[in-house]
Amino acid sequence: MATPVALLSESVLGWSIFTVVLLVILAFCWVYIRKYQSRQESEVISTITAICALAIALITSALLPVDIFLVSFMKHPNGTYKEWAANNETRVQIEDTVLYGYYTLYSIILFCVFLWIPFVYFYYEEKDEDNNNKCLQVKNALKYTIGFVIVCSALLLIGTFVPLASPPNQNSTQWQKVQYLFEELGSSHGLAALSFSISSLTLIGMLAVITYTAYGMSVLPLNLIKGTRSVLYERLENTEDTEEVERQIDKLKAKCADGRPLSMRDRRNLQDLEDKLQLLHRRGRHLEIAERNCCNKVGSALRPMKILLGVFFILVALLFFVTLFISNLDKALHSAGISTGFIIFGTNLTNPLNELLLALQPVFPLDYVLITVITMYFVFTSMAGIRNMGIWFFWIRLYKIRPQRTRPQALLFLCMILLLIVLHTSYMIYSLAPQYVMYGSQKYLLQTPLPTAVPSQSNRSATITKICDADAPEDQCTVTRSYLFLHKFWFFSTIYYFGNWAFLGVFLIGLVVSCCKGKKSVIEGEVDADDSDFSDDEYVH
């Protein structure tokens, strides 16, 4: 009777923590979206879609620590299986539960990215065109969404028939081990199709991480440390600029006081000056509001705390940088090479974050908290990067992300980007802590011969405890389903590996750029020349 009770208690503990995190995630997503959505253009369907999409992404990341916890808690610290996990069928049943969770969440992600979010986006675009016919709006939105459905179907079809064949010039021993690990996951064509589609989305997420997260990791802490410019100084500077522009306008208008028309060049200069004057007046209104804003006054009082938080964030960013560099260097030196996706079993170089997670894992849920903090850190730094850069398509800026003034379409774009970014964080966390993500804190028993001077006693051996790695017997270590899901296709792992190097490079560039920039304005991003009057009035009133 003890075995089922122990099994139930271990499972309930892991899933109870997951449920608590789930509720926290839902609350966070609601507050996050409500903070940035436009107050006058808010749309119920786009708000709900954005909240659900972001929640699904974060929940998927929250499942990773549960996966690691379950494979780790099957064993005692001495390397033996616990009584309730001694049966291989029981272990498979537990891991299948996690696998079904990944199946469900990844399927929902595909549904959101390729069907639901595009449909809501195009539906709102049709609404913007003053189309009051609901049926026609739905019809046109579905027409545009079909293209995304075709892409999704193509990815699923390709994933179904892409074989996991051995690439040329591979290390046969390593590759045989890789094949065995994937056989553990099963050979279902449905799984292969889903894994291929998710890996394709993760590639897009990798590009978003390289673009937004790498820059955000440098700009967020440095902005906290540097702070903002003084509101009083900015108002004085804005007043002086306004007076100077008004003098230039009066000077140009004086040229036509006697009825003579202005030249083409003067008319163009006059128009530019009037536009600049309008922008300065708007800046003045925003600065006046900022001066009266209680939040800015509280922020000034909390300045020391912001500096400490900025120092903490930059230290965390540097820790990630060093850890990722060591992990990539380890793969370059000790993996089977590009032909196997730079897959490596265990760690050969000391990895600080991996060691920290392994140390915290036995005291559950400390490792769960740390993984959640890492995921949230990626989200916050990604959001900082997106807000500073905006949403771009090549060299064209599509949308700006600003508190209480973000359009519904921009919110949908924002959540899709964050969804893809969080999707890629599963591989990023593996890169930061490969041993932890693959095996958790599992250990196994190894028989080693004892040296002896007496030939008749040469068969004596001792049992030692080792951390699970590729050399462990097949029935002694269980690999997390997350690792297998993300590494089923070796060529994706190869691209992820080079993407990590690009991430490190962009982070260094962003760090240099952020250091060279001065303090940002207290109304940074609130007033731009290409803003509409409607957008400005929404903020002021």
Curated annotation (Swiss-Prot):
Q: What does this protein do?
A: Lysosomal membrane chaperone required to export cobalamin (vitamin B12) from the lysosome to the cytosol, allowing its conversion to cofactors. Targets ABCD4 transporter from the endoplasmic reticulum to the lysosome. Then forms a complex with lysosomal ABCD4 and cytoplasmic MMACHC to transport cobalamin across the lysosomal membrane. May play a role in mediating and regulating the internalization of the insulin receptor.
> Which GO-annotated molecular functions does the record name?
cobalamin binding
Q: How is it placed in the membrane, per its record?
A: Multi-pass membrane protein
Membrane topology (Cytoplasmic)? 32-50, 123-145, 211-306, 387-409, 510-541
Entry similarity comment: Belongs to the LIMR family. LMBRD1 subfamily.
Presence of keyword Signal: no
Q: Which organism is it from?
A: Danio rerio
Q: Where in the cell is it found?
A: Endoplasmic reticulum membrane; Lysosome membrane; Cell membrane
Q: Iron: is it a keyword of this entry?
A: no
Give the glycosylated residues: N78, N88, N171, N348, N459
Source organism's superkingdom?
Answer: Eukaryota
> Which biological process annotations from GO are given for this protein?
insulin receptor internalization; protein localization to lysosome
Identify the keywords attached in UniProt to this record, alphabetized.
Cell membrane, Cobalamin, Cobalt, Endoplasmic reticulum, Glycoprotein, Lysosome, Membrane, Transmembrane, Transmembrane helix, Transport
Would you tell me the Gene Ontology cellular component terms? clathrin-coated endocytic vesicle; endoplasmic reticulum membrane; lysosomal membrane; plasma membrane
Q: What is this protein called?
A: Lysosomal cobalamin transport escort protein LMBD1
* Range of residues in the leader sequence: none
Spell out the coiled coil positions from the record: none
Task: Give the stretches traversing the membrane.
Answer: 12-31, 51-71, 102-122, 146-166, 190-210, 307-327, 366-386, 410-430, 489-509
Q: Which residues lie on this side of the membrane: Extracellular?
A: 1-11, 72-101, 167-189, 328-365, 431-488
